Curated annotation (Swiss-Prot):
It catalyses: S-sulfanyl-L-cysteinyl-[protein] + uridine(34) in tRNA + AH2 + ATP = 2-thiouridine(34) in tRNA + L-cysteinyl-[protein] + A + AMP + diphosphate + H(+). The keyword tRNA processing applies. It holds the Pfam family tRNA_Me_trans_M. The active site is at 104 (nucleophile), 200 (cysteine persulfide intermediate). Gene3D superfamilies: Adenine nucleotide alpha hydrolases-like domains, HUPs, Translation factors. It is found in: Cytoplasm. ATP binds at residues 13-20, 39, 128. PANTHER family: MITOCHONDRIAL TRNA-SPECIFIC 2-THIOURIDYLASE 1, TRNA 5-METHYLAMINOMETHYL-2-THIOURIDYLATE -METHYLTRANSFERASE. The gene is mnmA. Residues 150-152, 308-309 are annotated as: Interaction with tRNA. Catalyzes the 2-thiolation of uridine at the wobble position (U34) of tRNA, leading to the formation of s(2)U34. Disulfide bonds join 104-200. This is tRNA-specific 2-thiouridylase MnmA. The record marks 129, 341 as: Interaction with tRNA.
Length: 371
């Protein structure tokens, strides 16, 4: 055990899953002064009256006791509601498709949680994210995780230098299979626990049903771009650009896809064919632009970008504008760019930062994806 690490306090965000369990285990093995914190972000009771957060916290307790670290539960429900859930609902009201994971990392895990950890004397916080940080000169670079399938830099694109200087990602250099193996060898209680998927506050519940509890659904017409009425939609908030499932349009030929929303008229526009021309665009305007380093940026950046999680990178040219927005021009047309989602910039394995997709363009004209 390294002696110098024992003077360094690391507070680990523990969710009750295998990734954060192994994160805490590794840091403890490396001799750090480790504290486990369970973040309670949502008052979550399933249909049987069981609070799933309680089950997860029980797993945190089991693992913390196994590896011999102190643990606490901290309630961030108010911060989460104000900063993440309110944003989530507001975006749906605007007809967009939000990314709560990006906002949660920016406002909760690496802000509210980081501040709480510092009040406990933390030198660093650590999470089970599949990403890497590397010190280069005076700055910290955010790098993709080694496991391509699990890399989570897309969701971390809004982190600043001040945040990155305080984080550790022990799993960033590992494949998921290795993480499971470490958990099994260490006999951790969460070694065989299945990964959680989807949006944390929805859990296993039906998305439509969940959203309708907070936003009133307004059914309306489903039309082609030529105005032919094909049926009814359940509420514009339930649909996203490029969506195929749940439209309820039968018949012969190719499947139908969502190609736009008219909020004023409450109309959902659909067209036939995966490669319908309306689904393709050549540029976008992004807001909330944030970079992971403080270095001076040129007005034009040649790099690659992701427009959704686990998507293959696309070559782009980013033009930073005076108003703080950015025009992102694609080397090749891209399908189903979705307003409200994150656009994230990369230079090789370095995550440069990103922003929020606001409008989508083709041949110099704005597409009416959300109008």
């Amino acid at each position: 055990m390294s002696t110098n690490n024992s003077d360094i306090r690391v507070v680990v965000g523990m969710s009750g899953g295998v990734d954060s369990s192994v994160t805490a285990h590794i840091l403890k093995e490396q001799g750090y002064d480790v504290i486990g914190i369970f973040m309670k972000n949502w008052d979550d009771t399933d249909e049987f009256g069981v609070c799933t957060a309680t089950e997860d916290y029980d797993d945190v307790i089991r693992v913390a006791n196994q590896i011999g670290i102190p643990y606490y539960a901290v309630n961030f429900e108010k911060e989460y509601w104000d900063k993440v859930f309110t944003y989530f609902l507001d975006e749906y009201k605007l007809g967009r498709t939000p990314n709560p994971d990006v906002m949660c990392n920016k406002e909760i895990k690496f802000k509210a949680f980081l501040e709480h950890a510092e009040s406990l004397g933390a030198d660093y916080v650590a999470t089970g994210h599949y990403a890497q940080v590397k010190k280069v000169g005076d700055e910290i670079e955010l790098l993709r995780g080694v496991d391509n399938n699990k890399d989570q830099t897309y969701f971390l694109n809004q982190l600043s230098q001040d945040q990155l200087k305080k984080v550790m990602f022990p799993l960033g250099g590992m494949e998921k299979t290795e993480v499971r193996e470490i958990a099994k060898k260490a006999g951790l209680a969460t070694a065989n626990k299945k990964d959680s998927t989807g949006i944390c506050f929805i859990g296993e519940r039906n998305f439509k049903q969940f959203l309708s509890e907070y936003l009133p659904a307004q059914p309306g017409e489903m039309r082609t771009l030529n105005g032919e009425v094909l049926g009814k939609h359940d509420g514009l908030m339930y649909y996203t650009i490029g969506q195929r499932h749940g439209l309820g349009i039968g018949g012969d030929g190719e499947p139908w896809f969502v190609v736009g929303k008219d909020l004023k008229e409450n109309v959902l526009f659909v067209e036939q064919g995966f490669h319908h021309e309306t689904l393709y665009s050549d540029s976008l305007i992004a807001t909330d632009i944030s970079f992971t380093t403080n270095a001076e940026k040129p007005k034009t950046i040649e790099c690659t970008a992701k427009f959704r999680y686990r998507q293959t990178d696309t070559k782009v040219t980013v033009h930073l504008r005076e108003d703080g927005t950015a025009e992102v021009v694609f080397a090749d047309p891209v399908r189903a760019i979705t307003p409200g989602q994150a656009v994230v910039f990369y230079d090789g394995d370095i995550c440069l930062g990103g922003g929020t997709i606001d409008t989508v363009w083709k041949n110099g004209a704005k597409l009416d994806y959300v109008g």
